[in-house]
């Protein structure tokens, strides 16, 4: 059985677009936390914008947990994308161009071509707006044939189109085999452990594996984003059916 090296969060460069795909309860949110945590420990981050859908099951309202100061809930992410696209918002993001911001869009549902085009726009504008953008979703639904231009791609399974297209091709080139069962055995090996994901680097075309829980942190003595919550005054919106006028994206 072939093997691959571990992924290091040091490999995440400035203004990257990161996609995380996997079924429910495989550890997508835990992985996001780990990536954001390490980015904040390694860089001077200006702001964090973390969006979750209104019906997210990963938020426990009965506890005053870490998300209560960090998460922005939304019931229509289209509105958020529309607001983000406004020139006034982009100008605000560019005020301190030397400091990078992080935008997390958790559990998105790119179910139609217009939404996919907006996601592409966000990705293409990431350097202009000096942001790293992290998306997570369960699958691409009826438009799962679309391959979006992400820099890093984390997959918790080998069933979705992007995983098959990216990983299988690079697997064949890297390990000189075309046997489909070898690829299935390979991906099953890394997806059977919870919080474990395969990682594809869209620039170097390298394959890695990463466990969001067991991977050794390289920044044990640095402040994390949980320690810096007072600087990221992002309110949580509960039980609402309307996006407020003042979006978190505003600075």
UniProtKB/Swiss-Prot annotation:
User: Which InterPro entries does this UniProt record tie to the protein?
Assistant: P-loop_NTPase
Quote the protein name from its UniProt record.
Uncharacterized protein L666
**What is the protein's species of origin?**
Acanthamoeba polyphaga mimivirus
- Organismal lineage: Viruses, Varidnaviria, Bamfordvirae, Nucleocytoviricota, Megaviricetes
């Amino acid at each position: 059985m072939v093997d691959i090296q571990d992924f290091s969060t040091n490999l995440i460069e400035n203004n990257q677009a990161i996609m995380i795909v996997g079924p429910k309860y495989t550890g997508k949110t835990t992985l996001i936390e780990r990536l954001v945590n390490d980015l904040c420990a390694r860089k001077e981050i200006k702001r964090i914008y973390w969006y979750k859908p209104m019906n997210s099951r990963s938020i426990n309202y009965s506890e005053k947990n870490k998300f209560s100061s960090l998460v922005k809930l939304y019931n229509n992410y289209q509105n958020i994308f529309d607001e983000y696209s406004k020139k006034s918002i982009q100008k605000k993001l560019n005020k301190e161009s030397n400091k990078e911001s992080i935008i997390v869009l958790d559990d998105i549902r790119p179910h139609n071509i217009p939404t996919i085009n907006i996601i592409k726009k966000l990705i293409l504008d990431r350097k202009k707006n000096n942001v790293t953008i992290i998306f997570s979703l369960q699958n691409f639904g009826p438009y799962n044939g679309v391959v979006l231009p992400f820099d890093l791609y984390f997959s918790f399974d080998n069933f979705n189109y992007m995983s098959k297209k990216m990983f299988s091709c690079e697997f064949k080139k890297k390990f000189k085999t075309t046997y489909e069962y070898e690829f299935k055995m390979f991906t099953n090996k890394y997806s059977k452990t919870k919080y474990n994901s395969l990682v594809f680097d869209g620039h170097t075309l390298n394959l890695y594996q990463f466990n969001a829980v067991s991977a050794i942190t390289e920044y044990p003595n640095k402040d994390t984003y949980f320690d810096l919550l007072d600087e990221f005054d992002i309110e949580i919106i509960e039980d609402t059916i309307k996006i407020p006028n003042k979006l978190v994206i505003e600075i």
